[in-house]
Design a protein with these regions (language model features):
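Conserved nucleotide-sugar phosphate-binding/catalytic loop shared by glycosyltransferases and other
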Residues: 4-9, 32-75
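An amphipathic, basic-hydrophobic alpha-helix
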Residues: 65-94, 112
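Short amphipathic alpha-helix
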Residues: 14-26
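Donor-nucleotide binding loops and adjacent catalytic segments primarily
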Residues: 38, 42-45, 50, 170-216, ...
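Short beta->alpha connector loops at strand-helix junctions that form conserved
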Residues: 56-61, 98, 120-123, 143
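Active-site-proximal region of nucleotide-activated glycan assembly enzymes
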Residues: 113-168
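An aromatic- and histidine-rich active-site surface loop
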Residues: 42-46, 92-113
């Protein structure tokens, strides 16, 4: 059976965009049986109890950049062989990844399978995984119109991937006390932090007794 394969690993920053794309496809009538998810032990936590067909594998991650991947080249080659053999029987129509350390593996496997390969890049500066994989991609969908360090002829700007289920605010209206949270991602954190500090300077927003604010950031980014 032909399937669309979605490859996403690690934390919610990479897994949730893939899940939101999948959910939009399901809402448009795509059968869940035509979707296969490839992830790791961290990523699978976001798909538990959602009844998707999945492949879970300990893909190599690195905190030392490209050096860490070179030191684990044997494990990476093993993961490529494993994924190629696993996906071959499904005869996938395409491979789609949201980046991180699985992206280069997905790129090579897509070439071995001779199927189209697509990338979604959330940040304005592409991470190492997507940067290395972009030359293999048919299209790189971006959240920003001016995404850096990826070939311009590969980019198709589509805007950020959103969770459309959040448009129902009935529960918020029923809550007498409201807490607003601010949290930035790996590359969006500075912009969001700056916005929070600017927001805090406006005393109008702190005269409301029923509203409180929580700002999640690193200690080194905290302004006292």
């Amino acid at each position: 059976m032909n399937k669309g394969v979605f490859l996403c690993v690690g934390t919610g920053g990479h897994v949730l965009p893939a899940y939101n794309v999948i959910k939009s496809m399901l809402d448009q009538g795509i059968d869940k049986k035509n979707i296969l998810i490839v992830t790791d032990e961290r990523g699978i936590e976001y798909f538990k109890e959602k009844d998707f067909e999945t492949i879970v594998y300990p893909f190599v991650s690195s905190r030392k950049g490209i050096t860490g991947y070179l030191l684990n080249l044997g494990k990476i080659l093993k993961s490529i062989i494993y994924l190629y053999k696993s996906l071959k029987k499904y005869k996938p129509q395409f491979l789609f990844t949201t980046g991180a350390y699985i992206a280069p593996v997905a790129a090579i496997v897509s070439k071995l399978l001779k199927v189209n390969f697509y990338i979604q890049e959330q940040n304005i500066y592409s991470g190492l995984g997507n940067k290395l994989s972009a030359p293999f991609a048919k299209i790189v969908y971006t959240s920003f119109p001016d995404t850096k360090n990826i070939q311009k002829n590969k980019i198709q700007y589509c805007g950020p991937v959103l969770n459309l289920d959040l448009n129902n605010n009935n529960e918020i209206k029923k809550t007498p006390n409201l807490t607003i949270g601010f949290q930035g991602g790996s590359q969006g954190s500075k912009e969001i932090n700056d916005l929070v500090y600017k927001f805090c300077e406006d005393e109008r927003y702190f005269d409301i007794d029923t509203v409180s604010y929580t700002h999640l950031t690193l200690p080194t980014r905290l302004l006292v």
